């Protein structure tokens, strides 16, 4: 009896593509056994099976497919070098991200610092405005009839705007000098600053008509500014001493002209100061009333006193005229850039005087 793996079955297995070589060996063994038992040469001869060449081709195809699949799997698996490259790229990306975070944090700290400084400046300005408002409330700028002096109230509003504009112009000068703009552009800024001071002198002239004592007493200025005040403003000679260190180098001709300007300014200051002293003396004499003649000469003496007070307005205007002339003469003596540096120094000086007053007012008070 034949084994279960007959030639017909082998052929069907080959057609299905699941032929097993071990099954072929088993089949051959059964055939040889049948030949020995039957002792029939015809049977033995007919039992020899010719191997189909397609079997070898099929086996070769299986081996080739296996090798190619194995090679493909190996190719798909990343090598150690690729892993190292990926790790390096990830590490570089993390370093860049950390650097970006540090830079963002640094910029955030700078913005916070600038914001805190701005708040502090605003606090100082608010404190100064509160002090000025309180001073206005206490004095009221009242005239003899108790009405508000509109001329002085208008001057205080205009002067507040003038200070804001002054701060902006000083900042423009600083930026222009740092950026090295052309002399033509810089000259326009210098002339604009000089005109800005001229506007202040005109404002003061109008205020002097409303109340010269308010103006000459310095009630419109801070406490530190009043400490340096001379006839309603700064001394021209003081101005020259402040800006001189920022004008170097000067030519010999410039040095000579600046010295002459200092000398003439000092002489004009002395003349105005002497005039103020004589005015005070004359005013005091005009109101000294002898008890014997009080009833008959009182109106005459008071009229003379009023005339003397009216002359005080002229002294304030002359002092402002001297200040304006000193600024203009300095601009003529100096180059454009020297003038810009001088105006910048003057603006910073006046600004720091006002800031010093605010700091003094905001200082901690010792308990009494």
UniProtKB/Swiss-Prot annotation:
Function recorded in the entry: Transcriptional activator that binds specifically to the DNA sequence 5'-TGACG-3'. Recognizes ocs elements like the as-1 motif of the cauliflower mosaic virus 35S promoter. Binding to the as-1-like cis elements mediate auxin- and salicylic acid-inducible transcription. May be involved in the induction of the systemic acquired resistance (SAR) via its interaction with NPR1.
Quaternary data: Binds DNA as a dimer. Interacts with NPR1 and NPR4. Interacts with GRXC7/ROXY1.
Region (Leucine-zipper): 119-133
Protein name: Transcription factor TGA7
Domain bZIP: 91-151
Residue ranges of coiled coil: 92-142, 252-285
Residue ranges annotated for the DOG1 domain, each copy included: 152-363
GO CC term (a single one): nucleus
Protein family (similarity comment): Belongs to the bZIP family.
Localization terms from the record: Nucleus
Keywords, in A-Z order: Activator, Coiled coil, DNA-binding, Nucleus, Transcription, Transcription regulation
Gene Ontology MF terms in the entry: DNA-binding transcription factor activity; transcription cis-regulatory region binding
Cited SMART domains: BRLZ (SM00338)
Organism of provenance: Arabidopsis thaliana (Mouse-ear cress)
Gene3D superfamilies for this protein: 1.20.5.170
Pfam family, one: bZIP_1
Biased composition (Polar residues): 70-82
Span list, region Basic motif: 93-113
Main localization (coarse): nucleus
